[in-house]
Amino acid sequence: MINNIRQDAEVRMEKCLETFKNNISKLRTGRANPNLLDNIKVDYYGSIMPLRQLANIIVEDTRTLVITLFDQSIIKRVEKAIIISDLGLTPDLSGTIIRVQLPSLTEERRRNLIKIVRNEAEQGKISVRNIRRDANDHIKILLKNKAISIDEERRSQSEIQKITEAWIRRLDQILSEKERELIDF
């Protein structure tokens, strides 16, 4: 029973970490990354489709993305979708491909992005702590139902605490890497 509670907590904490990584990977750091365009949707013959499903997006250099559309007839719609997105990107049509140059980040924008990343990290930590609380509550229920002893309860809660601290350290490590990336570019 206790192993199931611990494993469930670890799986849920790992999902929190993956969500955090996914959220911060979409932030523009000055370095080209195809994930920047994940939220761009394009009108494709009456259906709203993600750009990623309509094109191949590759990194040409550190500050340029190249978009090669599967259907060239929608090139203007894709250009418009990129322009109206709130990413501050300007597409450049070059025949059958679209190049997107990433402008360099201003100091103010860097500080703003660091605040956003720190906030995302804090939300991740809160989620991890909530998972710890849920696991501890389940352990207390087992104690109340006399399924485990007081010693087992304390040992289990100590284990859960160590697991929580490990996942929070991982979150902090990813946070510091992202902050360094934002400062360096």
Swiss-Prot record:
InterPro entries: Ribosome_recyc_fac, Ribosome_recyc_fac_dom, RRF_sf. It is found in: Cytoplasm. One of its GO terms (molecular function) is ribosomal large subunit binding. GO terms for biological process: cytoplasmic translational termination. Keywords: Cytoplasm, Protein biosynthesis. GO terms for cellular component: cytosol. Pfam families: RRF. SUPFAM superfamilies: Ribosome recycling factor, RRF (SSF55194). HAMAP family: RRF (MF_00040). Belongs to the RRF family. Responsible for the release of ribosomes from messenger RNA at the termination of protein biosynthesis. May increase the efficiency of translation by recycling ribosomes from one round of translation to another. This is Ribosome-recycling factor.
